[in-house]
């Protein structure tokens, strides 16, 4: 048995709004299924061996998206601890996306032009923020800082569909349901999605 608590109604327990789970473990041979109650108080009977992580809710919807075939692009080659500039200059001219918010993208400029997963690579840019404001970088114009990651795409149309999905009510619900630690979006989650995860 596993009960997930959202933190919204539990302030009287710890005097702070914090998410937590509680569970009951029995000393018996392993069961194949576990009763899980999510943040929306919906009950599910799940084989937890089939999950690398559990969403806080929208479990059925997200289960249909799993499949380990979404290619995530992430490394820290353009970490902002490395030498960079806030403005484009003669030496610092390669644009690297550091932040993405409602106002658009925040750029840092670096000297080196890395082409492994950054420049020249078609991708949809996402950020480790709580909320997502996806950017279709099909032309591979941008590198990514330690706060930004990419979803590999093959066509501009595929990127447009991913952006459309993540901006939809369903996409926002999926993103909101997959917050664990400090409400940031974990790029590892996308690696567990199937190739058609964004198809509504």
Model-derived regions: residue spans:
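Conserved S-adenosyl-L-methionine
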Residues: 1-9
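C-terminal substrate-recognition regions of SAM-dependent nucleic acid methyltransferases
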Residues: 9-200
């Amino acid at each position: 048995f596993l009960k997930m608590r959202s933190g919204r109604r539990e302030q009287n327990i710890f005097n702070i709004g914090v998410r937590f789970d509680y569970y009951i473990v029995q000393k018996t041979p392993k069961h194949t299924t576990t009763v899980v109650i999510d943040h929306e108080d919906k009950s599910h009977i799940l084989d937890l061996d089939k999950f690398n992580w559990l969403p806080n809710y929208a479990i059925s919807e997200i289960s249909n998206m799993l499949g380990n075939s979404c290619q995530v692009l992430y490394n820290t080659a353009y970490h902002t601890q490395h030498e960079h500039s806030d403005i484009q200059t003669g030496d610092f001219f390669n644009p690297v996306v550091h932040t993405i918010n409602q106002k658009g993208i925040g750029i840092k400029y670096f000297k080196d032009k890395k082409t492994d997963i950054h420049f020249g690579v078609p991708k949809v840019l996402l950020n480790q923020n709580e909320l997502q404001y996806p950017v279709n970088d099909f032309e591979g114009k941008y590198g990514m800082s330690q706060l930004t990651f990419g979803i590999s795409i093959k066509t501009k149309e595929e990127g447009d569909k991913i952006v459309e999905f993540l901006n939809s009510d369903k996409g926002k619900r999926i993103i909101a349901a997959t917050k664990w630690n400090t409400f940031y979006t974990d790029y590892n989650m996308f690696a567990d999605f199937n190739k058609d995860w964004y198809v509504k």
